[in-house]
């Protein structure tokens, strides 16, 4: 099935990609970034620190990315120093979730809308939802209605809607556990099926790889839960779960594991259309910035950060499929 895009959405999608492949840098982290910074200093990270680090990453790495994902809370200064060639996505959700309940309901930023995100110069709206396909029906209906609203907003503003799905299990506390690894493919692929329906108005899915590669033979250091063939089948099932373009998030794994995973995904038959890669690219700059200052962080980004993004781009050249084949 080929999906039809409006002229404006097509132009925006082209601005966000290079030759149909989305090689985007993700730096919309807020809560996670504050926690990373807090590991290296005793005082609470300041707004100025967060804005400065985001701006450094944007300035130094967007010349090598097709686009950058930022948040409107701390990322607007960074959006203004990005490469002229790089597109911009802005996150629409509040960071984090209420840990006292298993529902993880979504919430929009209070003073933002799809209209305002477009006015801020973004080519796309990105929204994150936590979803448990096997969770309570009442909660999941609330989440579906929420995404329908955002889809309608994005249609009205004629701006692409990138939906990020992070899966979880209401009964399993640790997503890194073997217990969750056993159900991850089901969680990821079934959630993709749900939100690929036309009623949600999603243009691109930003998703997890369907297997925790740390439990796959040939990738695992310890316990092996999956053969390579079982893992490959999960990627094939993922490809079959949607007609929409989909891109992978790096989920905080190392640059090397993420790159190896992309190669495995492509060899398995996943026709993914790029990545929104965050911590796997820039995480090392946080410690340097806090301990040695902005100039040292800039130097790290020009060397290690560049190496990470350059290696990733080379892998994408060999593995990713253009979204233009689907739209």
Curated annotation (Swiss-Prot):
The Enzyme Commission number assigned here is 4.1.2.40
Keywords linked to the UniProt accession: Lactose metabolism, Lyase
Query: Which lineage is the organism of this entry classified under, starting from the top rank?
Result: Bacteria, Bacillati, Bacillota, Bacilli, Lactobacillales
Its family? Answer: Belongs to the aldolase LacD family.
Cross-referenced HAMAP family: LacD (MF_00734)
Protein name as it appears in the record: Tagatose 1,6-diphosphate aldolase 2
Catalysed conversion reaction: D-tagatofuranose 1,6-bisphosphate = D-glyceraldehyde 3-phosphate + dihydroxyacetone phosphate
User: SMART domains attached here?
Assistant: DeoC
User: Does the record bear GTP-binding in its keywords?
Assistant: no
* Species of origin: Streptococcus pyogenes serotype M3 (strain ATCC BAA-595 / MGAS315)
Stored PANTHER family? SULFOFRUCTOSEPHOSPHATE ALDOLASE
Q: Name one GO biological process term.
A: 6-sulfoquinovose(1-) catabolic process
Alphabetical list of InterPro entries matching this protein: Aldolase_TIM (IPR013785), DeoC/FbaB/LacD_aldolase (IPR002915), LacD_aldolase (IPR050552), Tag_1.6-dipho_adolase (IPR005927)
Q: Which Gene3D superfamilies match?
A: Aldolase class I
What SUPFAM superfamilies does the annotation carry? Aldolase
Q: Give the superkingdom in one word.
A: Bacteria
Q: In which pathway does it act?
A: Carbohydrate metabolism; D-tagatose 6-phosphate degradation; D-glyceraldehyde 3-phosphate and glycerone phosphate from D-tagatose 6-phosphate: step 2/2
The enzyme class is: lyase
Write one Gene Ontology MF term.
6-deoxy-6-sulfofructose-1-phosphate aldolase activity
């Amino acid at each position: 099935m080929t999906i039809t895009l409006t002229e404006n959405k097509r132009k925006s999608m082209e601005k966000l990609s290079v030759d149909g492949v989305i090689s985007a840098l993700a730096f919309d982290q807020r809560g996670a970034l504050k926690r990373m910074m807090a590991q290296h200093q005793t005082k609470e990270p300041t707004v100025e620190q967060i804005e400065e680090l985001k701006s450094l990453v944007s300035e130094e790495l967007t010349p090598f990315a097709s686009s950058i994902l930022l948040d409107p809370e701390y990322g607007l200064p960074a959006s203004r120093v990005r490469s002229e060639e790089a597109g911009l996505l802005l996150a629409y959700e509040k960071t984090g979730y209420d840990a006292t309940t298993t529902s993880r309901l979504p919430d929009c930023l209070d003073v933002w809308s799809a209209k305002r995100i477009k006015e801020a110069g973004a080519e796309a709206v990105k929204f994150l939802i936590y979803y448990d396909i096997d969770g309570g029906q009442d909660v999941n209906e609330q989440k579906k209605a929420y995404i329908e609203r955002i889809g309608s907003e994005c249609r009205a503003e004629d701006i692409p809607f990138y939906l990020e799905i992070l899966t979880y299990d209401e009964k399993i506390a640790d997503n890194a556990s073997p217990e969750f690894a056993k159900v991850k493919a089901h969680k990821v692929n079934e959630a993709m099926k749900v939100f690929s329906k036309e009623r949600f108005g999603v243009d691109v899915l930003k998703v997890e790889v369907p297997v925790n590669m740390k439990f796959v033979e040939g990738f695992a250091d310890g316990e092996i839960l999956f053969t390579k063939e079982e893992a490959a089948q999960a990627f094939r099932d993922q490809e079959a779960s949607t007609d929409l373009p989909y891109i992978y998030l790096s989920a905080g794994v190392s640059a090397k594991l993420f790159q190896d995973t992309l190669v495995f995904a492509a060899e398995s038959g996943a026709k993914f259309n790029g990545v929104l890669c965050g911590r796997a690219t820039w995480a090392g700059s946080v410690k340097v910035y806090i301990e040695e200052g902005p100039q040292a962080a800039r130097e790290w980004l020009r060397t290690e950060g560049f190496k990470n993004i350059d290696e990733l781009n080379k892998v994408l050249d060999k593995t990713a499929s253009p979204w233009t084949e689907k739209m």
